[in-house]
């Protein structure tokens, strides 16, 4: 008896800062639970985000923008990722950081537009007519060559297909005969033919012939069920950026010159507005015909204060364009100078005319009990065991410094606990790593005390 151990094909992913976030943690009425789906506290912000999710699902939020504003470490990025989790895989979600727009290769506005187009999905529904079955007959019909001479040409191909429900005889175009020869189709093979494109696919040999030979390399497949002629609906999800790239960079030939030409091209090519307008026309035509459906997704721009005045102006135009996604901004700044100017001070570093277009969600600082719950969640995600006094001490450290610093102490404390031969992290382990690794406040205090010892 042979027993094989099956290895999992699921990709192992690193435990990141927001691995524990699984959703917004709302009940059926849309009210936030104290601790659910990886989020703790921030009830008002989560309830507001829940309303936004409902609007996105009902397609009533496209072309509008949202701002998550609050101090550092209050869960702005976590709420944005929770929105993405609630929307699911079918709605495009494109995260980026404000500083990503600055590139030596392409313009700032081009980077923004690329990400805008990445956030807009297109769901294309295509009905394919398929003939599927076991080949019972394959007869090419020859005629005299119309060009004269002694040669003969194939005028059509007669093919018989059988399924569990019945049989059908088809008269096919001579071009399909070449495809049949390429696939090496014989009587007894199970094939399917696409009616629209004429594509032929050999699925394998019918399992009724399985006992024909002792040594056989064939793959045997069962006789197809249902009718010979079937209709299949194929749904394809693409983004507008995928269409832009496919049309901006058509594939070259296979010869050496074209391959060298592709290597010589710059890394990034700007997609022209003219091309985008042409693609929009085709997309609109598909939508009018009912072939395709537009799926407005979410563009999440973190650290929005890193954008400058030119990009903010471009955002006005992009948000008011007919095809626009839902844009979520996040910032941890109060009143500060707008980047790209010298003296214009504005709330969150965003111009007032753009702020006027935004719905603002505020995030508040966590209480000590909330911090303790978050640290427990993180410890559970990372598979660490802590004693209750250790959790209490970490939440105190988080309150006096930042939540991020308290969470970052977990892994070094676990290492310290392993060195001491224990399985549970104690309060002493936390104190040890707290004294070894400084937080920003203690480091700046140390810097101000010993300022004359450092180089200017």
Swiss-Prot record:
Any Pfam family from its record, for instance, is: TIP49_C
Organism for this UniProt entry: Drosophila pseudoobscura pseudoobscura
The record, for InterPro entries, names: AAA+_ATPase, P-loop_NTPase, RuvB-like, RuvB-like_C, RuvBL1/2_DNA/RNA_bd_dom, TIP49_P-loop
Major enzyme class: hydrolase
Q: Which GO terms describe its cellular component?
A: nucleus
Q: Which reaction does it catalyse?
A: ATP + H2O = ADP + phosphate + H(+)
Keyword flag rRNA-binding = no
* Xref: Gene3D superfamilies: 1.10.8.60, P-loop containing nucleotide triphosphate hydrolases, RuvB-like helicase, domain II
Family classification: Belongs to the RuvB family.
UniProt keyword Ribosomal protein, yes or no: no
GO MF terms on file? ATP binding; ATP hydrolysis activity; ATP-dependent activity, acting on DNA; helicase activity; transcription coactivator activity
Its assembly, as annotated, is: Forms homohexameric rings. May form a dodecamer with rept made of two stacked hexameric rings. Component of the chromatin remodeling Ino80 complex.
Positions with a binding annotation for ATP: 70-77
Q: List localization entries.
A: Nucleus
- Recite the lineage of the species: Eukaryota, Metazoa, Ecdysozoa, Arthropoda, Hexapoda
Single Gene Ontology BP term?
cell division
- EC no.? 3.6.4.12
**Its biological function?**
Acts as a transcriptional coactivator in Wg signaling caused by altered arm signaling. Pont and rept interfere antagonistically with nuclear arm signaling function, and are required to enhance or reduce arm activity, respectively. Also an essential cofactor for the normal function of Myc; required for cellular proliferation and growth. Proposed core component of the chromatin remodeling Ino80 complex which is involved in transcriptional regulation, DNA replication and probably DNA repair.
The name this protein carries in UniProt is RuvB-like helicase 1
State where it is primarily located. Answer: nucleus
Q: Which UniProt keywords apply?
A: Activator, ATP-binding, Cell cycle, Cell division, Chromatin regulator, DNA damage, DNA recombination, DNA repair, Helicase, Hydrolase, Nucleotide-binding, Nucleus, Transcription, Transcription regulation
